[in-house]
Amino acid sequence: MTAFSGNTLSPAVTEGLLALHRYRLLSVAQVATASGLKPSYLRDILRVLERKRYLGSIGNVGLRGGSKAPKLYFLNRSGYDLLRDGCGLEESHLGEFVKPHSGPKWTPIMAHRMATIDLLLAVETGLRDRPNYELITTFHEYRRVKRGTTAQPETSDYVAAPEAAGNRIVPDAGFVLENCQTGKRGLFFIETDRGTMRLTRGAEGSYSVAGKFALYERYLRGLRFADTYGPYGVFSFFTVLFATTTQGRLENARLASADLDHNLHPYFRLATLEIGTHSFFDPIWLSRDVRDKRHGTLIKIN
């Protein structure tokens, strides 16, 4: 197996393991997307790495209704060491080893996690033939960082003082993109909607898509994000990318946003999950304004 021989990794397998390090838990299909290898070929490689205890896994169990949870792989400490030595990066550049924040069992939230990671992988692969843009970094809520004495989702922040529950925001994911020609950087947040959240705002304290949009509006106006993400660039605004299950739900989300600030509609872009994961940087994105029928891109097309 030329992709993995002894302790030597091929460049493609290295890319796949780097994605495992970034995103903690990935399916065979997701590692294949990151590496560019065929899933049928990669599946055997991952099994070998798991037998050698470089990888661990969860899932691959039956679910209610007769369906089956996919098998998700993660790096063990020995796998991290193999990756570090294979790609020649110091730990300070690769990032320290972190075990996935997950128990040994499959949970319903995993479907949301996988859909979110699919979108981040679409960002990565979508830039492969766009050399004028560089992905600076990615964030996602399932990656924990230590703040004070507790571990928090790395995307968690507060839209304003005081730092109370009503002001807390936790984007599903985010990324920073740089235009290599201008040197300017853009900040993007991703919201992955699986169709389970109420669309319109209800009682105070209840969760809804419109309520989440309103929280992002406060985040935009308060500019606290500029300090939080200051280490990655100078940002005066951000763009929220809302990816949902169907075109019908997308249009209903736009209708539910009709009473929100019209001046902030351009900072919110919507698409379906299926289209987003396959054509992320193509002209697929609609404004939050239900009256606007135009599809736009997130970057300039030369």
Regions found by a protein language model. Give the residues of each.
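Glycine-rich, often proline-containing surface loops adjacent to acidic residues and nearby aromatics
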Residues: 24-25, 93-102, 184-197, 236
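Nuclease-adjacent, charged terminal/linker segments that flank catalytic cores
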Residues: 1-107, 113
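Short, flexible loop/turn elements at secondary-structure junctions
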Residues: 24, 35, 77, 142, ...
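Active-site metal-binding core of divalent-cation-utilizing nuclease and nuclease-like domains
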Residues: 108-110, 121, 129-189, 208-211
